[in-house]
Swiss-Prot record:
GO biological process: arginine deiminase pathway
EC number of the protein: 2.7.2.2
Entry keyword annotation includes Oxidoreductase: no
Reaction catalysis annotation: hydrogencarbonate + NH4(+) + ATP = carbamoyl phosphate + ADP + H2O + H(+)
Pfam families: AA_kinase (PF00696)
Metabolic or biological pathway: Metabolic intermediate metabolism; carbamoyl phosphate degradation; CO(2) and NH(3) from carbamoyl phosphate: step 1/1
Species annotation: Staphylococcus aureus (strain MRSA252)
InterPro entries: AceGlu_kinase-like_sf (IPR036393), Asp/Glu/Uridylate_kinase (IPR001048), Carb_kinase (IPR003964)
Keywords carried by this UniProt record: Arginine metabolism, ATP-binding, Cytoplasm, Kinase, Nucleotide-binding, Transferase
Family recorded in the similarity comment: Belongs to the carbamate kinase family.
Protein name as catalogued: Carbamate kinase 2
């Protein structure tokens, strides 16, 4: 069997100063060109991606157009919208590349639900800001309409709604994703960390939360029995003491040493630390698992061992 890889695209892959569809599609086109050698390789590929700016824009649109005739959609539904939108853009550009290569591979997007624990303590301490900024007066009105919602001041720029970021427990569509990936298909899944859902009676329902993309990608990689989790970010390597005079580049590291560095606070919370924690979980999930952390431009060189940070047991 060929190597199976989950590629977690960082936000920089689709980030642009302009928020138009055309500008974001152009950014994705450039990003996918960097992955062209991987698409031309025998590897079985699943791609996950972030959705922060996109879902933020959707939430602002929902708030501005909210009325009896066009009611605002909830966060879980906006998450599904963003998965479809970004998945469509990715499909278009990957399909363009596959056609140029005369490849017989196909590409498709799975709108992905991620099960979370309704008793996760993170629900008691929402910290993830989403959507537009509000004045204090607007927040007072919103809290009457949404009594369960939490709003916090954001660096003096106004107030924003904050939601929980629970840990993923399972990926509901993982068997479908695995079946597709084990063929020649390139699968786009777990966009934005997936749509958070909890089990209720004989089905699942969405909850107001945002799942960390790297944790969701790790869970997906584990469930589909991937060999490699590749986390693409905005730096070529992981560093300890990043941006300090004594910063040190890591090229190859075992999990035991990585855990020691994490415990010593060598990685920044909210940026590199979640990636490190996801890497540790995946490597420990089975035999011969590896994680590569690098930037988009070096993805293929990292896969063949020439670039990036390589993490193993």
């Amino acid at each position: 069997m060929k190597e199976k890889i989950v590629i977690a695209l960082g936000g920089n892959a689709i980030q642009t100063k302009e928020a138009t569809a055309e500008a974001q599609q152009t950014a994705i086109r450039r990003a996918m060109q960097n992955l062209k050698p991987l698409f031309d390789s025998p590897a079985r590929i699943v791609i996950s991606h972030g959705n922060g700016p996109q879902i933020g824009g959707l939430l602002i649109q929902q708030a501005k157009s909210n009325s009896d005739t066009t009611p605002a959609m909830p966060l879980d539904t906006c998450g599904a919208m963003s998965q479809g939108m970004i998945g469509y853009w990715l499909e278009t550009e990957i399909n363009r590349i596959l056609t140029e290569m005369n490849s017989d591979r196909t590409v498709g997007t799975i709108v992905t639900r991620v099960e979370v624990d309704k008793d996760d303590p993170r629900f008691d301490n929402p910290t993830k800001p989403i959507g537009p900024f509000y004045t204090k007066e607007e927040v007072e009105e919103l809290q009457k309409e949404q009594p369960g919602s939490v709003f916090k001041e954001d660096a003096g720029r106004g107030y924003r709604k904050v939601v929980a970021s629970p840990l993923p427990q399972s990926i509901l569509e993982h068997q479908l994703i695995r079946t597709l990936a084990d063929g020649k298909n390139i699968v786009i899944a777990c966009g934005g960390g997936g749509i958070p859902v909890i089990k209720k009676e004989n089905t699942y329902e969405g909850v107001e939360a945002v799942i960390d993309k790297d944790f969701a990608s790790e869970k997906l990689a584990t469930l589909i029995e991937a060999d490699t989790l590749m986390i693409l970010t905005n730096v070529e390597n992981v560093f300890i003491n990043f941006n300090e005079p004594n910063q040190q580049q890591i090229d190859d590291i075992d999990v035991a040493t990585l855990k020691k560095y994490a415990a010593q606070g060598k990685f920044a919370e909210g940026s590199m630390l979640p990636k490190i924690e996801a890497a540790i979980r995946f490597v420990e999930s089975g035999e011969n698992k590896k994680v590569i952390i690098t930037n988009l431009e070096q993805a293929y060189e990292a896969l063949i061992g020439n670039k990036g940070t390589h993490i193993h047991m």
